A protein has these predicted regions:
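Hydrophobic residues within beta-strands of alpha/beta enzymes
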Residues: 135-137
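Acidic/aromatic-lined carbohydrate-recognition and catalytic surfaces
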Residues: 4-125, 129, 141-186
Length: 186
């Protein structure tokens, strides 16, 4: 998910007015509405990142994980993104790398920065004030509040990208079967 504005609706899905109408109708029908919040990252088109990437000394300069290159110009660690490739992307304006656990278009927020935490709490309050009943928190396992120096992951010559490990398959089968039990049309 690429979040460009944490307090707006993706225009593909309508407007805030449309959302308010949906929310009111759902509540009139006795339904509760939950929305996704992605606290770990945002879009590289979000105003927070657009400002942060401009320089090392603006008000949001440390809202993301920015790290100088190694002496040879390479990425600061050997970390890989979940979607393949390096977890670091070079930003020529800052002459630094930024961390992204997923896509380069999804830079990780820096939870070591209290202003980031406050901004995310403000986002939650914004949606609660609109009447949202709850949230599904996405990608929380990738929240990173550590600070440099970052360390390389140890080499793992046996690592293979592939299907779900055998020992995890029974649990996910059980999860799938439970969902089908309650919703047989799935």
């Amino acid at each position: 998910m690429c979040i460009r504005d944490s307090c707006d609706v993706n225009p593909e899905y309508g407007s805030l007015d449309d959302f308010d109408n949906l929310l009111a109708t759902a509540h009139d029908l006795g339904l509760r509405v939950m929305i996704d919040i992605v606290p770990a990252h945002c879009s590289d088109q979000h105003s927070w990142f657009l400002e942060s990437r401009q320089s090392k000394d603006n008000s949001r300069a440390d809202w993301f994980h920015w790290v100088d290159p190694l002496p040879d110009g390479s990425a600061p660690t050997n970390w890989l993104s979940f979607f393949g490739g390096r977890a670091w992307t070079w930003e020529p304006r800052r002459q630094q790398y930024y961390l992204h656990n997923f896509l380069p278009s999804q830079p990780n927020l820096n939870f070591a920065n209290n202003a980031v935490r406050k901004a995310l709490l403000d986002v939650v309050c914004f949606w609660f004030d609109r009447g949202v009943d709850g949230f599904r928190l996405d990608a929380v396992h990738t929240i990173n509040a550590s600070s440099p120096p970052y360390k390389d992951n140890p080499p793992n010559p046996d690592f293979k990208l592939g299907p779900l490990p055998q020992d995890q398959q029974p649990f996910f089968r059980q999860l799938h079967d439970s969902a089908q039990f309650n919703q047989p049309e799935i």
